[in-house]
């Protein structure tokens, strides 16, 4: 690398540092003074269920005054309490209202009533990466790399704010109208300076240190990135079995097999991300994220252009209009019931 290139690299690293310092300032302001109750259920017209979960659902809604479409996450307070997810739910809202990055879904409104908590986010009509990946089978390496680069930048941003994401998987990555990623579902995200111990995540994506009940840190996100890149490029995850316990055995074994079509650069990157030994895992070494960004598999990636969304996406989802739901599955519809008495007031006071 010539002197000019070295100088350019140096100035890029400096400008990233400046950017992240400013981002942290912005984040902390909102983290310390979270927005509360800036809308109500009556402001929205409910259109269709986009997804369901163990303690709530996500619906397409239309803001009556602005006619904008949004995705509204509705959480049943009593179910959240029953499933011991109070802390996770409060984390999700507090984090989402404070972050700001091109590849993170934006929280526009949050409010609660006697029965439910509501988070209203921008609606991403392209649907989940999961459904496109299953339909196409697998992504070419350049296609996978385009998405992977956005996750690398997003994790660099989140980790600089002391946030661990902990739930990377194709179901939580939405494809927007320009073919870029929007990371959604911050239900397991957490602000942690040192280590944390909670067992959470999706079996196929869990890092070995989580399975082994060790204290863990941000490095679990880099492991999950390895799993995601593998799954995007192969069409199936690196560790899979019928029962979670069998998956866990494979994960902690430290053995990964690669399809013959994987390039040698891809295999090398994955061996360094799917590294059981934390002292050797990329993203967790003294150079931090730059071991990943400067890896040969990313040699063609223009990180600044990706951040600026100037790179042409390999795939643009098809949809008709901003309220189209054809990229989402159908679910049984259910009325939103609101109690006449307030439930769990104490638990969700800060929401």
Swiss-Prot record:
It is found in: Cytoplasm; Cell membrane; Membrane; Nucleus. SUPFAM superfamilies: Protein kinase-like (PK-like). It is a lipid-anchor. Keywords: ATP-binding, cAMP, Cell membrane, Cytoplasm, Disease variant, Kinase, Lipoprotein, Membrane, Myristate, Nucleotide-binding, Nucleus, Phosphoprotein, Serine/threonine-protein kinase, Transferase. GO terms for molecular function: ATP binding; cAMP-dependent protein kinase activity; magnesium ion binding; protein serine kinase activity; protein serine/threonine kinase activity; ubiquitin protein ligase binding. Isoform 1 is most abundant in the brain, with low level expression in kidney. Isoform 2 is predominantly expressed in thymus, spleen and kidney. Isoform 3 and isoform 4 are only expressed in the brain. Residues 299-351 form the AGC-kinase C-terminal domain. Residues 44-298 form the Protein kinase domain. The modification Phosphotyrosine is found at residues 69, 331. Activated by cAMP. A number of inactive tetrameric holoenzymes are produced by the combination of homo- or heterodimers of the different regulatory subunits associated with two catalytic subunits. cAMP causes the dissociation of the inactive holoenzyme into a dimer of regulatory subunits bound to four cAMP and two free monomeric catalytic subunits. Interacts with PRKAR1A and PRKAR2B. The cAMP-dependent protein kinase catalytic subunit binds PJA2. Interacts with GPKOW. This is cAMP-dependent protein kinase catalytic subunit beta.
């Amino acid at each position: 690398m010539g002197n000019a290139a070295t100088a350019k690299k140096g100035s890029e690293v400096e400008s990233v540092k400046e950017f992240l310092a400013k981002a942290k300032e912005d984040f902390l302001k909102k983290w310390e003074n979270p927005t509360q109750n800036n809308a109500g259920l009556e402001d929205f017209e409910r259109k269709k269920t986009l997804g369901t979960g163990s303690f709530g659902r996500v619906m397409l809604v239309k803001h009556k005054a602005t006619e904008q479409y949004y995705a509204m996450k509705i959480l049943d307070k009593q179910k959240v309490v029953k499933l011991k997810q109070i802390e996770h739910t409060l984390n999700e809202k507090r984090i989402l209202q404070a972050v700001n990055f091109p590849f993170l879904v934006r929280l526009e409104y949050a409010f609660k009533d006697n029965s439910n908590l509501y988070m209203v986010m921008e609606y991403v009509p392209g649907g989940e990466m999961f459904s496109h990946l299953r339909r196409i089978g697998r992504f070419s390496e350049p296609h996978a790399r385009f998405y992977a680069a956005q996750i690398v930048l997003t994790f660099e941003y989140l980790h600089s704010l002391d946030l661990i994401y902990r739930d990377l998987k194709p179901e939580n990555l939405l494809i927007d109208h320009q073919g870029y990623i929007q990371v959604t579902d911050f239900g397991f995200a957490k602000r942690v300076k040192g280590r944390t111990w909670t067992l959470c995540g999706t079996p196929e994506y869990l890092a070995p240190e989580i399975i082994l009940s060790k204290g863990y840190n941000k490095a679990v996100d880099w492991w999950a990135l390895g799993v995601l890149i593998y799954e995007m490029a192969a069409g199936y995850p690196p560790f899979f079995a019928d029962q979670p316990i069998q998956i866990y055995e494979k994960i902690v074994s430290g053995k990964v097999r690669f399809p013959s079509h994987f390039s040698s650069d891809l295999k090398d990157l994955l061996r360094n991300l799917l590294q059981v030994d934390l002292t050797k895992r990329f993203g967790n070494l003294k150079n931090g994220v730059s071991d990943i960004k400067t890896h040969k598999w990313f040699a063609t990636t223009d990180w600044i252009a990706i951040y600026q969304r100037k790179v042409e996406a390999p795939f643009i989802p098809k949809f008709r209009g901003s309220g189209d739901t054809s990229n989402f599955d159908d679910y049984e519809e259910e009325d939103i019931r609101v109690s006449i008495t307030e439930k769990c007031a104490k638990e969700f006071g800060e929401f």
